């Protein structure tokens, strides 16, 4: 049975409304270049950002793991279909994109003590090395997805961006901007960053800067498994608006006892997540990541577009 058709949980008051395709929204006063302000939230959701003004002080931490048998089978299938290099990262990102299609409240963010939604723009940031060597430079790529993207769509978008940054683009826009800031003396740089924070607080930061900023988006994901180490709890940045940091580790084997008393060896991957609790209620976050685990148990559902896409409140 398709996991997405199983929606036994009752929707919360400020959860979402069903609509497909996405309703067209006119830009209103108070909206930002990267999202629209949510004006129909419950009072507590509007007050909590003033009680917990910083992202670092409003972070919640949790960890979990998933058994990788079905994911490995799925990866082999996709590679046999010609998707070279398709791996766990693609499955995790595709699963997260699918979460947003069913739990759009997870795609919210805080800025200037107000709650906004990215709407149908799912922005995921990823750090990559230009070459797999110790000396190779790192850069950050920003990927845009939509709630209807399949695993194949996710693969194509990621592959295109990585190839562009590794081959045809020696300096990304972010790298070029960082080099410019590097020439500014320390005291002036501190004031420049303060001014950027001020613009961002009031939603006046230009869209061009938001687009190259690694501190703005829906989620930041990092693979510690590629380094051969366990996942870490990575802090959220007080600058920008990224509300979720997702870290996953390397595969490992675990012995488990079956019902008949025999021992079976299975492979798992651990992951750790840090979230800004102010974006939505705990029910939305918990049910969203429960959905993610269901997709990891049956990743083949990611080959098809979601039957229904849910959109956030106004």
Residue map of PLM features:
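C-terminal catalytic/motor cores of large multi-domain enzyme assemblies
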Residues: 2-314
